[in-house]
């Protein structure tokens, strides 16, 4: 399998990107990685490590797309950027997947304009896996489509179901519709119409899920439009971040608290691991004709390694073919 990596995407590029690539090929000799970016910078980073040099190659890219640029215009104009060249490798059939920790909007625009959507899919959905109290869960869409039609949400649910079954090994994953109340009649026109379609879809739909219940992980796939999903995602991240800050402040407030924390260290370590985004790799853009994964902007080498493994799993489990086939059956 050949994977294209945006070598300059993210806060820690290219150091974390290169290290993650090296760690990934050491764990899986069957993959080949193409890193796009300034060849001098990428080469300098690669020289720090010992690895099978035939497993990683560089495609020179002098430019970078930043988060401050208009996504569509940047993709169209910056054809010498690391992100454009990584996407183009998939478009031209020279790579099977693309991973970037750079601009989410530009990656989304590039995936849509350059790679395209699976036939029958109306919108590509950003679909991160989040840590839950009982088990991880997916939010789809988490920001790619601010405005949605009811049928889009049914497609998001189907794609999430296929990902959970194929990549995570969960049989008959549960699907919930994010809403302001659990009752069927709650919500706006979008959620009311989507509820009816999901109920009739044949998917394992369990009804509405209120945001306060989202983090339990009792429902595997939370379906919503991108505005709601992105708000939910950022609120969740913010609460987790501030919770850890509050906990740290309390632990360091007294000697007694420090002693207690020392005794609880293994428990606290496991708790922190649950909320470590690097454990989950990246967020797949479900519905794209190619495997497209958005890594977190502050991804470290572990996150990149896991995102690469995630791409491999998507390819080996043929999720694109499954989405195409099951969409036809649903319709």
Curated annotation (Swiss-Prot):
Transmembrane segments: none
Pathways involved: Lipid metabolism; phospholipid metabolism
GO MF entries: phosphate:acyl-[acyl carrier protein] acyltransferase activity
SUPFAM superfamilies recorded: Isocitrate/Isopropylmalate dehydrogenase-like
Gene Ontology terms describing biological process: fatty acid biosynthetic process; phospholipid biosynthetic process
Gene3D superfamilies (UniProt xref): Isopropylmalate Dehydrogenase
Family matches, as HAMAP family: PlsX
Subunit comment: Homodimer. Probably interacts with PlsY.
Task of the protein: Catalyzes the reversible formation of acyl-phosphate (acyl-PO(4)) from acyl-[acyl-carrier-protein] (acyl-ACP). This enzyme utilizes acyl-ACP as fatty acyl donor, but not acyl-CoA.
Protein name per UniProt: Phosphate acyltransferase
């Amino acid at each position: 399998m050949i994977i294209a990596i945006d070598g300059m995407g993210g806060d820690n590029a290219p150091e974390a990107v290169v290290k993650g690539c090296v760690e990934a090929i050491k764990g899986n000799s069957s993959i080949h990685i193409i890193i796009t970016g300034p060849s001098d910078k990428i080469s300098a980073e690669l020289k720090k490590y010992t690895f099978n040099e035939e497993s990683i190659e560089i495609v020179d890219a002098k430019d970078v797309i930043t988060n401050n640029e208009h996504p569509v215009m940047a993709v169209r104009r910056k054809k010498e950027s690391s992100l454009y060249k990584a996407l183009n490798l998939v478009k031209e059939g020279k790579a099977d997947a693309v991973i970037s920790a750079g601009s989410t909007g530009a990656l989304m625009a590039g995936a849509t304009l350059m790679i395209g959507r699976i036939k029958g899919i109306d919108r590509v959905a950003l679909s991160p896996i989040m840590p839950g109290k009982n088990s991880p869960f997916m939010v789809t869409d988490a920001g790619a489509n601010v405005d949605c039609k009811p049928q889009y949400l049914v497609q998001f649910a189907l794609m999430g179901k296929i990902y959970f079954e194929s990549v995570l090994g969960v049989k008959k994953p549960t699907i919930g519709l994010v809403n302001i109340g659990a009752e069927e009649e709650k919500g706006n026109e979008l959620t009311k119409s989507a509820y009816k379609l999901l109920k009739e879809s044949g998917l394992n739909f369990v009804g509405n899920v209120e945001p306060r219940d989202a983090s339990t992980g009792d429902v595997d796939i939370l379906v919503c439009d991108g505005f709601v999903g992105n708000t939910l995602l950022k609120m969740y991240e913010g609460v987790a971040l501030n919770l850890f800050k509050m906990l740290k402040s309390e632990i360091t407030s007294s000697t007694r608290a420090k002693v207690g924390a020392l005794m609880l260290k293994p428990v606290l370590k496991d708790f922190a691991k649950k909320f470590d985004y690097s454990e989950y790799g990246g967020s797949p853009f479900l519905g794209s004709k190619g495997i497209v994964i958005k890594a977190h902007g502050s991804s470290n080498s572990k996150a990149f390694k896991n995102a690469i493994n995630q791409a491999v799993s998507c390819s080996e489990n043929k999720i694109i073919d499954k989405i195409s086939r099951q969409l036809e059956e649903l319709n």
